[in-house]
Amino acid sequence: MAKKSKIARNDRRRETVERYAARRAELKEVIRRPGTPEPERNRAVEELRRQPRDASATRVRNRDSVDGRPRGYLRRFGLSRVRMREQAHAGFLPGVTTSSW
């Protein structure tokens, strides 16, 4: 089980990313576009720099939805490998079967 403070911090980061996502995309497009005048590009870079660090999507960590474990995350299930194995053996994941060959 991950610390509750780590899980809460990650949740706050997700909210911050969601809040700033549209404006960040606009600014990045202005910066990326080759025809943008230099002063406008500089203003966009400066505004992007003034945004909070946690507004960047790379700051969000994928965590197990059950206990918040940060490692071994499987996107398809939203679980860590440990929790996925437990739930698969218990039959809680429809369509998941143990392999045999």
Swiss-Prot record:
Record's compositionally biased regions (Basic and acidic residues): 38-53, 61-70
Record GO terms (molecular function): rRNA binding; structural constituent of ribosome
Single GO cellular component term: small ribosomal subunit
Alphabetical list of Pfam families matching this protein: Ribosomal_S14
Matching InterPro entries: Ribosomal_uS14, Ribosomal_uS14_bac/plastid
Keyword rRNA-binding recorded: yes
Keyword terms of this UniProt record: Ribonucleoprotein, Ribosomal protein, RNA-binding, rRNA-binding
Disordered: annotated segments: 32-71
GO biological process, one term: translation
SUPFAM superfamilies xrefs: Glucocorticoid receptor-like (DNA-binding domain) (SSF57716)
Disulfide bonds: none
Function: Binds 16S rRNA, required for the assembly of 30S particles and may also be responsible for determining the conformation of the 16S rRNA at the A site.
Alphabetical list of PANTHER family matching this protein: 30S RIBOSOMAL PROTEIN S14, SMALL RIBOSOMAL SUBUNIT PROTEIN US14A
Subunit structure: Part of the 30S ribosomal subunit. Contacts proteins S3 and S10.
Family label: Belongs to the universal ribosomal protein uS14 family.
Protein name stated in the entry: Small ribosomal subunit protein uS14A
